[in-house]
Amino acid sequence: MMLPISVCMIAKNEDNHIEECLKRLKPCRFEVIVVDTGSVDRTVEIAQRYADKVFHFAWCNDFSAARNFSIQQASNDWVLIIDCDEYLENVNLAELEEATNRNSHSVGMIVRNNPYSIQGVRSIMSERIGRLFNRRYCHFEGIIHEQVFTLDGREPDSFQIPLTFYHEGYVSESGKRMRATRNLELLLHDLESKGPSPFIYYQLGQNYISLNDLDKAVQYCQKGLKLNADPNSAIVQSMVETYGYCLLELAKYDIAMELQDIYTQFSQRADFIYLMGMIYMKNGIYDKAIEEFRKATTFSTCSRKGINSYQANYNIASIYENMGELEEARTYYKKCGDYAPAVRRLKEIAAS
């Protein structure tokens, strides 16, 4: 089956990632467009071996301009946007075709799995991102952290599609800092030209996290949350959780407690419930912490892998162990399955 979908990518100095990315796409038989924005490594050479078309675009400090140029080069109206460090994990082509036939004016949301570490154990955070759309109705806007809008400037409806990507996302510390410094300049320009919005403040917060300036990240998240932000917005939900974890990292536990004031608005997410459990635990309010962690385990879905199961149970077990209630601790450590920190604690308790 060859679907009328063109994969459109922009790239610069991505020879560490682009080959794996393009190899994973090959079985799908999508048309592949690569637009290079000034590579000095082997990116173009590799792209020419795998892609159907390779173009050059003079970088102008505008991601949307580069993205929109890439989709103009496609042979198909349906375009799938991916980055070079995103590797295809799962796809159902029959369901994908059916979904596009039903949703011609909407944006398809892929699943992107992002690796991260917690308590020294590698885990996954999953998110839905709008990446598939018909170029007759939509395009990109925004010079940085570009977003999909309809051609008349509205936010399009969305639909879920059976496409999952793994986000490798590894960048050296120096490369991460260089990228964050560049992005900061573009984000501040966007803020000045377009005015404040939850989206821009959230991205500024994330950018300052990349620059290891958590105080600045907190400041921008606070500004975003003061804009009467929609609690049903995925960006706003992520901003609340980012804000909370930054406060915990900064040991500002008393300020983090203020998130109780918006509990009702955000309590539909396991991620927020788990965060509240962490906040109560850091403040020594252990009964409330256990209550929130237990509540998190009642949710069927979450963004950060394990917070509705083994991570929540591990924290409950840790609290019971610290309180000297070893039987309860053992019970909850066992609920963590093969989660390495829990297995280790069970062995240490048995040996004590």
Task: Set out the residue ranges of the language-model regions.
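Short beta-strand/loop segment that forms part of the nucleotide-sugar
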Residues: 9, 30-38, 55, 84
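Short, well-formed alpha-helical segments that are part of the catalytic scaffolds
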Residues: 8-27
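A conserved acidic beta->alpha catalytic loop
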Residues: 24, 36-45, 59, 83-86
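Acidic helix N-cap motif at the loop->helix transition within catalytic regions
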Residues: 16-19, 41-50, 91
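Short aromatic/hydrophobic "clamp" motif used to bind/position activated sugar donors
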Residues: 79
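Conserved donor nucleotide-binding strand/loop of the catalytic core
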Residues: 45-65, 69, 73
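Catalytic-site signature of metal-activated, phosphate-bearing donor transferases
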Residues: 65-71, 89-216
